[in-house]
Structures are given as structure tokens and as C-alpha cells.
Design a protein with these regions (language model features):
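Short metal-coordination and nucleic-acid-contact micro-motifs, chiefly zinc-binding Cys/His arrays
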Residues: 37-41, 76-79
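Gly-rich Lys/Arg/Thr-decorated short loops/hinges at beta-loop-alpha junctions or inter-strand turns
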Residues: 90-94, 174-182
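Acidic/histidine-rich catalytic cores and adjacent linkers
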Residues: 41, 46, 52, 165-168, ...
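Short alpha-helix plus adjacent loop in nuclease-associated cores
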Residues: 241-262
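Acidic, glycine-enriched active-site microenvironments
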Residues: 99-108, 120, 185-188, 211, ...
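Active-site beta-loop-alpha junctions of metal-dependent nucleic acid enzymes
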Residues: 99-102, 182-206
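Short, positively charged, Gly/Tyr-enriched micro-motifs
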Residues: 48-52, 57-167, 207-210
């Protein structure tokens, strides 16, 4: 089967024909001549209407999908048209967009592989440059953002991840509906303005349709949600609550361990950090024996550990009423414990009591677990590339990997 036959089968365009195919001068590439079909009119690139021809430009080279390790190039002399609406402009061709050197099919091909491999690996695999892979991904992401639909967003989750040294963060907003999880928004820095930018994009009408919002306890997030999604049920992030409690327990353990060392007592808490921080089911056999020995002593660390473990019952309730009663009793006990880091946690939980109980009002359907999973995928995307140089490229890569954007149509799906 000849190459021209294959191209006519998988990449045929109305008004154009493939004329000749030959090896390039280096014998490592294939060049295919393209010409307009006889009697076909050129199309204006401005108004997309047929227009009479004006003249021809020098021959341009468009990169196509490689074939068996050979680079493939389409060679075509672009026509200029004399459009009555736009004047003399270059014609529109169906296989390329604007001044891109890559054909649309090749850009989509590279973008799909760039979702599976790092951009550098994609460039090396198909004998192209990193910049061209970047251009391909930017084209596909730009097209997808223009054509995506944002209707029927019922639940969102917001969180931040670090993307560069020096406390540089991204604000990420996800859709976390049961049937659809995707990235909706990437905001630069962890600020009130960056989160407000998401609501500017979706508009007041879509914001009014949001029923559930998951976030952590950072005050700017709480303020924006209260202002923009007052009708939504705001659910606090379980992951961050557990993390804060573990941090408080670790502070108690570290302070008590230092005091015991200063007073010359036996170092009972030495190498005990993960024994008290890990969940029981994740402990090793050695850590279980170590924990059992620790629980024999009347230490602040032991009392703080028991308070932390006791709080895990909170998440097992189904009724908001009973969960609220347990929370109140736990906070009462903790405030009488004389363990300041744990008392600080109790005060925080009391201040956000209503938002904590919203988890049960939502029937436990929404939590931060989905958000943390998507955050891990976002970090993996950046880690595969060992980081990106600019915020713009980072934003593009995250949309490409996580936003589930629609893709341009092509005459043939190669993979």
C-alpha cells in the first residue's frame, strides 16, 4: 500500500490532494507534496468564507505524524486570497492552525503521548523538540478550554499545592461530583484573589448551582465560599483536621522527650514518633510492641495519643446530632487535659463546629479524599518533568493531565 493511499484514507481533506511522496535529501524523512484540487476555492482565514485567489507564497513545510521512524512533512504553497471582507489575507488550510509548523493531527498525537510520558521523553521518542511538544499541548489545552462545558457542577473541592521553592503555591479547584472528577481552575499563589478568580470564570449563575464545597480551614477560603457560595453546604477537609491533630501530638511528644532528657530520666519516648502518629492497622509488629510498652506510662504523650485515637470515632457517626454531641464531649475532655497543643485543636474544632457537622449532613458523600488524590496526580505531573520553568507552562500541564478537556476532531484516530 502506498503512502498516498494511506494519507487519503486517514487524513483526507476536502479541496486538497496529495500529489507526490518521496524521501527527503537526508533519506531520514518523507516529503509529501500537497496541492489544491482543481476547481476548489480557497477559504479566507479571517471570515472562513470562500474567496478568489490573489497569489502564492513560498512553499511551507508542515510536520506530520512520523511513519516507521521516518519524519513526515507536508509541503504546500499557501495561497493568498482577495477577500471582500478581510482584504488580501493568507488562506485557511484544514490541516494546520495559524503559523504552527505542526499539523493539527501531529499536535494531537504528541499531546496524547505527553499525557502518558514526560514532555522530554515524548520529544525524544518522536525525534522532535521539547518546545514543539509544549506548543502541541498548549494548542490542545487551549482548544479544550474553549470548548469545555461547565454546566451541572454540583460539588467542588479547593486546595493548594507547592509548585516551586520559596513558598510558591497554586490554588486548585476541582469538580468532585460522584460521576465526574476533574480540574476546573488553576490560580497563581494561595490568595483570596486567586480563589475569587475561579468564580469570575464560571459566573454567578453557575456558582449559585454549587451545592457542596470541600476545603480546609484557611480563613480566606472560608471568606470566599461564604461570599460566593452562601447557599452551598461547606464541608471541612477531614485530611487537614487529622494532619493538624497529628502535628499537635508530635509537638507534645517532642517537648516531653526534651524535658525527660534535660531532667535525666530514662528516654522512654526515643524512636516513638511513628508509633503514635501512624494508624493502628499500619503499625509494624515491632511498633505495636513499642506502643504497648508506652501505654503503660502516665505520660502527656500517651494521654494526647488516647485523645487522638478517641476522636477517630467522630467520623464513624451517621447522624449530625450524635456526631455533634460526641464532638462537644471530646472538646470538653480535651480542654481539661492541660495539654496545650491538644487544647488548641479543641478550640479550633469548636470554632468550626457547624462546618464539621456538614460532613454528616451531606451523608458522607463528599470528603477531601478525592481532592488529595487529584493533588497527588498534580504533583506527579510536575515531578515527571522535574518542575516547569513558568507558571503558564505549569498551568497548561495540569489542565492537560487533570481537566478531562475535549479534544479537536481529526480525520482518523491513530491511538
Amino acid at each position: 500500500m502506498e503512502l498516498i493511499t494511506i494519507l487519503n484514507h486517514c487524513h483526507r481533506h476536502r479541496g486538497f490532494v496529495y500529489q507526490h511522496a518521496r524521501f527527503g535529501p537526508d533519506k531520514k524523512s518523507i516529503e509529501v507534496d500537497v496541492r489544491p484540487r482543481e476547481g476548489s476555492a480557497a477559504v479566507c482565514s479571517g471570515c472562513h468564507q470562500p474567496a478568489p485567489g490573489y497569489d502564492h507564497l513560498p512553499e511551507r513545510c508542515f510536520e506530520f505524524i512520523p511513519l516507521w521512524g521516518f519524519l513526515v512533512f507536508l509541503l504546500y504553497r499557501m495561497r493568498r486570497v482577495d477577500c471582500r471582507n478581510c482584504g488580501v489575507v493568507v488562506e485557511e488550510v484544514p490541516w494546520s492552525d495559524g503559523k504552527h509548523q505542526l499539523t493539527r493531527a501531529y499536535m494531537l498525537f504528541l499531546a496524547r503521548w505527553a499525557r502518558k510520558l514526560s514532555w522530554k521523553e515524548t520529544a525524544e521518542a518522536f525525534h522532535t523538540s521539547w518546545d514543539k511538544v509544549c506548543d502541541a499541548v498548549e494548542y490542545v489545552v487551549g482548544w479544550g478550554l474553549e470548548h469545555r462545558t461547565l454546566e451541572s457542577i454540583r460539588a467542588i473541592g479547593v486546595d493548594e499545592i507547592q509548585y516551586a521553592k520559596g513558598h510558591k503555591y497554586l490554588t486548585l479547584v476541582y469538580q468532585i461530583d460522584p460521576g465526574l472528577t476533574r480540574l476546573l481552575w488553576v490560580g497563581k499563589e494561595r490568595t483570596l484573589e486567586s480563589f475569587q478568580g475561579f468564580f469570575t470564570v464560571i459566573g454567578e449563575q453557575l456558582a449559585a448551582q454549587i451545592e457542596f464545597v470541600c476545603s480546609d480551614m484557611w480563613q480566606p477560603y472560608l471568606n470566599v465560599i461564604r461570599q460566593k457560595c452562601s447557599q452551598a453546604l461547606h464541608i471541612l477537609d477531614r485530611f487537614h483536621i487529622v494532619a493538624k491533630m497529628n502535628k499537635a501530638l508530635d509537638e507534645v511528644r517532642a517537648a516531653e522527650s526534651r524535658k525527660m532528657a534535660q531532667d535525666g530520666h530514662q528516654p522512654l519516648l526515643k524512636k516513638s514518633r511513628w508509633c503514635v502518629l501512624k494508624r493502628k492497622e499500619n503499625l509494624t509488629s515491632q511498633q505495636k510492641f513499642r506502643l504497648r510498652d508506652l501505654l503503660r506510662y502516665n505520660l502527656q504523650t500517651v494521654r494526647a495519643y488516647l485523645l487522638k485515637e478517641d476522636f477517630q470515632q467522630f467520623w464513624e457517626y451517621n447522624s449530625p446530632t450524635w456526631a455533634g454531641m460526641f464532638l462537644d464531649f471530646w472538646c470538653y475532655q480535651t480542654m481539661r487535659s492541660r495539654i496545650e497543643p491538644m487544647k488548641k485543636i479543641a478550640r479550633t474544632l469548636r470554632a468550626h463546629r457547624t462546618l464539621l457537622l456538614n460532613y454528616f449532613k451531606a451523608k458522607k458523600q463528599f470528603s477531601s479524599g478525592v481532592v488529595e488524590g487529584l493533588n497527588n496526580k498534580a504533583k506527579l505531573t510536575m515531578r515527571k518533568a522535574y518542575g516547569f520553568r513558568t507558571f503558564s507552562i505549569t498551568e497548561t500541564a495540569l489542565y492537560h493531565a487533570l481537566a478531562k478537556l475535549p479534544e479537536p476532531n481529526t480525520a482518523h484516530r491513530f491511538y
